[in-house]
A protein has these predicted regions:
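Proteins enriched for Cys/Gly/acidic motifs involved in redox and nucleic-acid/cofactor modification
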Residues: 2-214, 254
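Conserved SAM/AdoMet-binding glycine-rich loop
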Residues: 81-86, 95, 198-261
Length: 261
């Protein structure tokens, strides 16, 4: 996608750390802001809004995020109207939101992974108030559809099929910051893919913390990953289908047959 610049519009700058899931969620944050009259910019220096979409899987990602947040202190001092927001996995960790508030008192909005779809409401709340907005829900909610998306990787597109993870691997923090596994309806995923193909996208990557267990939380035996990729593969158009990430314990014979066909 080529984004044309309009000098009359306010500008937003989004900094993303971590996985493909975060990259796609940053596209959703951009979509929300674009729907409110903002346009993306490639530098924080002329931005009216700066959003950090953070990662906590690796300590290095947290250190880089904190370093870059701290570097905005002078910019915020020079521009009191600048709005700085921090979201993503880092903010979802227990006690991290208050720690960020203490370390960086110039942050305006802190929101958790379960509050991304609420970002528009939080942003409007900040525009109408001088108070800091901190919303980090501990419990994941149902899957919400219809969040606007400004895609930036044409002709490639990310499509979420699950959120969260039920595998509590010893080394991994994901279930604690992303919540329990929730699957999108198969019809919603297929319709999104159908529209992307119609729009000319040539590569679609299905996203989830564990795509192989797609549908396990839905009471319908036909809703599973093997059937999903089979149905998407039947769509008209010239495109490549990919997926990530997957856990070997849920890799079964129907899935092998679906991939091989």
């Amino acid at each position: 996608m080529i984004l044309t610049m309009n000098s009359n519009l306010k500008k937003c700058f989004i900094i993303t750390y971590g996985c493909q899931m975060n990259l796609h969620e940053s596209e959703k944050i951009a979509g929300i802001l674009c729907s409110m009259g903002y346009q993306p910019t490639n530098t924080e220096n002329n931005a009216d809004v700066i959003v950090f979409n953070t990662c906590c899987i690796r300590e290095n990602a947290e250190d880089r995020a904190e370093g870059n947040i701290g570097a905005l202190k002078k910019l915020k001092r020079a521009n009191k109207d600048l709005i700085i927001a921090v979201g993503g996995c880092m903010t979802q960790q227990k006690g991290q939101a208050e720690e960020l508030k203490s370390k960086f008192p110039f942050i305006d909005i802190i929101f958790g992974t379960h509050n991304l779809e609420d970002f528009k409401a939080l942003f409007l709340q900040k525009l109408n108030s001088k108070k800091k907005i901190i919303v980090v829900d501990e419990k994941e909610g149902p899957v919400k559809e219809g969040t606007p998306t400004t895609r930036t990787s044409y002709p490639n597109a990310w499509v979420n099929i699950t959120y969260g993870c039920n595998n509590f691997c010893t080394y991994c923090i994901v279930p604690y910051v992303r919540g329990r596994e929730r699957s999108r309806k198969m019809s919603d995923v297929i319709n999104e893919c159908k529209q992307l193909i119609k729009d000319g996208y040539k590569e679609i990557t299905l996203l989830g913390q564990n795509v192989n267990s797609y549908g396990n939380d839905i009471d319908d035996e036909n809703t599973n990953f093997a059937n999903l990729i089979s149905e998407i593969s039947k769509l008209d158009g010239d495109f490549r289908l990919r997926f990530m990430t997957n856990h070997p314990k849920d890799f079964n014979l129907p899935l092998i047959k679906a991939i091989s066909s």
